[in-house]
Amino acid sequence: MRALKRVVLWIGLIAVTAVPAMAVDSLYHAAVPVAGTSAAARNQAIAAAAAAVLVQLSGNPDVAIQPGVATALASAPALVKDYHYTEGGNGSLMLDVGFDPQALESLARRLALPVWPSPRPPVLVEIRIDGHPADAAALAGLVESGAARGVQFILPHAGAPAAAGVAACQHDALAQLARDYGTGLALVGQISGGDGSWTLVTGDTCQSWQSVSTNTTSVLTAAGNAAVDRLVARFAAAPAPAGGQAGALWVGHLRSASQYAAVMALLRNDPRIRSVRPMAAEGDGLLLSLQLDAPLATVAADLAASGHLVSAAPQPGADVSLDWVR
């Protein structure tokens, strides 16, 4: 490999390259009913909102009954970034609470909760019911069940990659998925007479299963929860030992300083990555040394599902190899 001269050149170029700022993540917000505007009622609602956010961060709907969680939620008001009162759909009073992301993730680590950190890519949903594409109304229950656990299901637009190609994890279909939807995650399904056939695509991995129900709404909601269960199992990481762990990551198809800057920003914004250090470069690829709070395989799988990167052929000296898509 070439010496680090090229890496230094790229670093110099980034000084004049703008990197888009990330949007505020809804993972750290929750709206809950509140009994009134008194401090006591507000603090009780804030604790409930913090529990809802921990569900979103961990993907575990039963997080509130985990050991130590109820006690820890008593300090939730100290973690609040902002809040405001709103009116619910039935006229009830609601409290919309935003928490400090670092404070909430720190709380989750202290409670030893597995966390799938932000930013999370959306999950494209391509489902046919009795041969016809499912519309937004039919998928409302699935979308709502995912949102409660911090997963955004999105519907395809015209020109979406062929469902068959996505479900088969074909490289071209996954690259189009990344370019068009900014994700490497998809749920492809067919329902016929209540029987469901499902494939969840996570980066370059496909998982398939069957379901049976006499109720289409129930089978869709169950499929959404099953997909979230699999996503959480794949991407949510428990706290690492104090010393962390090291790994070598190869990123290929970097053809400009702006792409290099985008990769570095993506890695440095991941709370599981303590440090990123360029080691060597060759052609349009870069070898990076990472210090992590989670296994590199877990982090790399998340990166491959982010819509920015796809799995690549193994490279010398790298534990994991990825190619830049956009």
What is the predicted function of each stretch?
Residues 8-18:
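Bacterial N-terminal signal peptides
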Residues 19-23:
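Sec/Tat signal peptide C-region and signal peptidase I cleavage site
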Residues 25, 44-59, 111, 148-150, ...:
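C-terminal/domain-edge helix-coil "capping" segments
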Residues 28-35, 177-224, 298-300, 320-326:
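Amphipathic beta-strand/beta-sheet edge segments enriched in Tyr/Trp
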Residues 33-37, 78, 88-90, 98-104, ...:
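Solvent-exposed coil/turn segments that connect beta secondary-structure elements
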Residues 46-68, 119-170, 263-287, 304-305:
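N-terminal segment of the mature soluble domain
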Residues 66-125, 137-140:
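Signal peptide-directed extracytoplasmic domains
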Residues 78-85, 152-157, 166-199, 303-319:
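A short, hydrophobic beta-strand-centered structural micro-motif
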